[in-house]
Regions:
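Bacterial N-terminal signal peptides
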Residues: 14-23
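A detector of low-complexity, intrinsically disordered, Ser/Thr/Gly/Pro/Ala-rich segments
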Residues: 7, 29, 125-127
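Short, low-complexity N-terminal intrinsically disordered segments enriched in polar/charged residues
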Residues: 24-52, 56, 60
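Exposed beta-sheet edge and beta->alpha loop/turn motif
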Residues: 93-158
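Positively charged n-region of N-terminal signal peptides that target proteins for export
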Residues: 2-13
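Short solvent-exposed beta->alpha transition segments
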Residues: 37, 52-118
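General helical secondary-structure elements
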Residues: 4-6, 39, 68
Length: 158
């Protein structure tokens, strides 16, 4: 007699539990405005040779100290050059596979990105001299934590 009602009631409770959990969960996708702000901040800091602002975009919680030093150095290489183009782009399946892998650090310890990437920042820099013009392209993964976009620095792998 209560078999059908029990199944229906259980289904309603599951739907309510999922809805309640979803309502309190943080959004995992950055808004277009947040993405623009991140890209604009990076571009302005890079072109202005503002290392402090570039370093403030690094997610350093739990970061391996040597990896952090490397990332700080890499974010400032070429500072002051003209950014020809800069964009946050969706990850390809290959990017996701690469980001999920542990990698050996300088001292041989295994490291992983400290945040799961949601996009990658692709920066094309143009350097002009009296004799020539050259361009270079760099890519870096971008993750999200507490509603903010970050460049995740590798941390010790679990």
């Amino acid at each position: 007699m209560f078999g059908g009602e029990g199944v229906r009631m259980r289904g309603i409770l599951i739907v309510l539990a999922v809805a309640a959990a979803s309502a309190g969960a943080p959004s995992l996708a950055a808004t277009p405005a947040q993405e623009r702000a991140f890209v604009d901040t990076y571009r302005k800091a890079f072109e202005a040779k503002d290392a402090a602002t570039l370093h403030s975009l690094l997610y350093t919680k739990g970061a391996d100290p040597k990896a952090l030093g490397f990332y700080r150095m890499m974010t400032t290489v070429g500072m002051g050059a003209k950014v020809a183009s800069i964009a946050l782009v969706d990850l390809t399946p290959e990017d996701r596979a690469r980001a999920d892998r542990s990698m050996p650090g300088v001292d041989g310890k295994m490291l992983r990105l400290s945040l799961e990437p949601v996009k990658k920042l692709v920066i094309r820099v143009e350097t002009k001299t009296a004799d020539a013009t050259s361009t270079g392209t760099n890519e870096v993964f971008v993750g999200e934590h507490d509603g903010k976009l970050w460049i995740p620095v590798p941390a010790p792998a679990p």
